[in-house]
Amino acid sequence: MAQEPILTARGLVKRYGRVTALDRADFDLYPGEILAVIGDNGAGKSSMIKAISGAVTPDEGEIRLEGKPIQFRSPMEARQAGIETVYQNLALSPALSIADNMFLGREIRKPGIMGKWFRSLDRAAMEKQARAKLSELGLMTIQNINQAVETLSGGQRQGVAVARAAAFGSKVVIMDEPTAALGVKESRRVLELILDVRRRGLPIVLISHNMPHVFEVADRIHIHRLGRRLCVINPKDYTMSDAVAFMTGAKEPPREAIAA
């Protein structure tokens, strides 16, 4: 591709005792694209995503964001750098309101002495910004911004998590199995949300086992096998059967896909 990648990894190694989860793994994410990451169970894709999102520190290798070497020691550092992750378990607090969940860990304090010394939250500002972010993604069918997340449907909860990531992910959004355990209708809405986020210019890393969803929204598909990137394919040029065959080792990918 003519553009320079916004996020790259080279030679990542991660060991857990005698198990090598990442074996000199490479990764490239380009501006404005949806890159799907697929692989069989135990292929190491989760470890790779954890490495680029700050959840684990690689034993070897280098990660670069916008061309600059980075080393995250925690997910918080990754978030501060502009990389947001929507986890499979959503990482939402069910008892808290939608607005509180949107700003969880990033609460807005009141100006002046009330915020500085008494740590009072500026709930009006948080509610206003949360409402604006949900509206941007067409999610204001949720009537009450102060209702508890536990009262929402699965698709609505996923929408809140996606809206939070889109609101604060200034450079990259990572989505881990965003349609898992959702019905057909709710999955459709989440896929539309993913495309909405992409239209806003944010590149997305999509981890999913749902091949129809992957082939519907991805611009490129990164296939991970035996701890490393096996190949990168364009979903317009290959079938789902091809992808599964590459992923399981039943079929060798073409040379140009391996070099991608």
Curated annotation (Swiss-Prot):
Show the CDD domains listed in the entry: ABC_Carb_Monos_I (cd03216)
Catalytically driven reaction(s): D-fructose(out) + ATP + H2O = D-fructose(in) + ADP + phosphate + H(+)
* Entry EC no(s): 7.5.2.-
Kindly report the protein's main subcellular placement as a broad class.
Answer: membrane
| Function according to Swiss-Prot or TrEMBL | Part of the high-affinity ABC transporter complex FrcBCA involved in fructose uptake. Is also a high-affinity transporter for ribose and mannose. Responsible for energy coupling to the transport system.
User: Can you name the source organism?
Assistant: Rhizobium meliloti (Ensifer meliloti)
Query: Record's family?
Result: Belongs to the ABC transporter superfamily.
User: Which positions does UniProt annotate for ATP binding?
Assistant: 39-46
Name under which the protein is recorded: Fructose import ATP-binding protein FrcA
Q: Which GO terms describe its molecular function?
A: ATP binding; ATP hydrolysis activity
Q: Where is it located?
A: Cell inner membrane
UniProt keywords (A-Z) are: ATP-binding, Cell inner membrane, Cell membrane, Membrane, Nucleotide-binding, Sugar transport, Translocase, Transport
